[in-house]
């Protein structure tokens, strides 16, 4: 998954006030200098501000970070909401497409998670009588079908999938907990 996935530069025009128009450039990953300001007024005349987060400094003195431009000085709530929603999206994307079982990519959409849980629960409740069960892994272009014939094998798959989800969630919570809004305060 590339840095900043699934975000690209998006431009949106909004009307506010007395028919005034503002243009917002939505979240993008930027390459720049290490030590970059997390909040910066880039154009005082037009009241343009940039918010930066997820700064990843590199050995060569440069840095990569996410950035969003505002047509006004963003409030604490706007900054917090922006960064938290980005971390939530990153966590969701990692859960959705980051798990593999025995080398096969497993798409963990909410629907698939529900189907895996239902199949596992039913197999446990019936002592494996509902087996075999077949799941499609991989992609639509390169599907890999896996048939679970033994309860232990299905249990192994399901507990690894749940463990992966829990690990990714914990990593996302840790990043969100480390976010410090005080670093964005400018007097």
Can you say where each PLM-predicted feature lies in the sequence?
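A preference for well-ordered globular domain cores
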Residues: 1-187
């Amino acid at each position: 998954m590339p840095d900043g996935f699934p975000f690209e530069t998006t431009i949106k025009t909004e009307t506010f006030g007395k028919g005034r128009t503002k243009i917002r450039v939505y979240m993008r990953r930027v390459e720049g200098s290490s030590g970059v300001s997390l909040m910066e007024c880039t154009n005082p005349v037009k009241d343009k501000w940039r918010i930066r987060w997820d700064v990843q400094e590199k050995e060569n003195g440069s840095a990569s970070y996410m950035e969003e431009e505002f047509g006004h000085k963003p409030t604490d709530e706007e900054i917090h909401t922006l960064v938290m929603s980005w971390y939530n999206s990153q966590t969701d994307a990692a859960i959705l497409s980051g798990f593999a079982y025995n080398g096969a990519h497993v798409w963990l959409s909410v629907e698939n998670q529900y189907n895996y849980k239902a199949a596992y629960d039913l197999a446990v409740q019936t002592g494996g009588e509902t087996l075999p069960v077949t799941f499609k892994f991989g992609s639509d272009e390169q599907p890999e079908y896996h048939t679970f014939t033994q309860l232990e094998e299905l249990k192994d798959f399901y507990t690894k999938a749940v463990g992966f989800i829990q690990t990714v969630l914990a990593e996302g919570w840790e990043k969100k907990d480390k976010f410090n809004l005080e670093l964005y305060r400018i007097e």
